[in-house]
A protein has these predicted regions:
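Bacterial N-terminal signal peptides that target proteins for export
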Residues: 2-14
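Short regulatory "switch" loops immediately downstream of catalytic or recognition motifs
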Residues: 1-2, 21
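Generic low-complexity segments that are intrinsically disordered, proline-rich and/or Lys/Arg-biased
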Residues: 7-8, 21, 31
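Terminal leader/tail segments of proteins
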Residues: 27-140, 144-179
Length: 179
């Protein structure tokens, strides 16, 4: 009744493989948040050491001054190995430079980040998908690794790069020029 047609299955397999490669070799940010476009990629270097390349994916109408009112994706492509615990602790330090929060919030957020952020190697990517009033979803190499559903955390965490008090003003300025 049904005849197997090897060429049909072979061509279907090729199509599936092509889709898989396209999704996994390219940036997943447009798929994570439809309608976003990348701003120019920026490199963060500290004391001459390259840390990561940062890319901000935004929708038309995005305003840096009111970044917490817009959905967007922040993508960090690491250029060196770092421990997840170091990323988490440094994030808390940087968040303090952007805004105030209590010791309880710090403890809760640090615990959440320690649970979420993995150790990274050169070539790994961390993405933060932000949706206003909801919080932040984190991905590691395009796989969801956790969520922190606290709008204040999201505002301060993403403010590390986007707030006017950022300690990486060159990244922010370059993205402002790209808007």
């Amino acid at each position: 009744m049904f005849a197997l047609r090897p060429q049909r299955y072979f061509s279907g397999g090729i199509a599936l493989l092509a889709c898989h490669l396209a999704l996994n070799l390219g940036h997943a940010s447009p798929a994570l948040l439809p309608g976003v476009q990348p701003l120019p990629q920026q490199r963060l270097s500290i004391w001459g050491f390259d840390i990561y390349d940062a890319r901000l994916w935004v929708r038309p109408g995005f305003s840096m001054a009111s970044y917490s009112a817009h959905a967007f994706v922040l993508e960090l492509s690491y250029l060196r190995s770092l421990e997840g615990s170091a990323i988490s602790k440094r994030s808390i330090d940087e968040m303090r430079k952007v805004g105030a929060f209590s010791r309880d919030q710090e403890n809760n957020w640090l615990k959440a980040m320690l649970d979420i952020f993995p150790n990274v190697q050169k070539g790994d990517r961390l993405q933060a998908v932000y949706v206003p009033t909801t919080g932040t979803e984190f991905l590691f190499n395009d796989k969801v690794i956790g969520r922190i559903q606290d709008p204040l955390f999201a505002q301060l965490f993403l403010g590390i790069w986007l707030h006017e008090s950022t300690t990486a003003p060159a990244l922010r300025q370059a993205w402002l020029k790209g808007l």
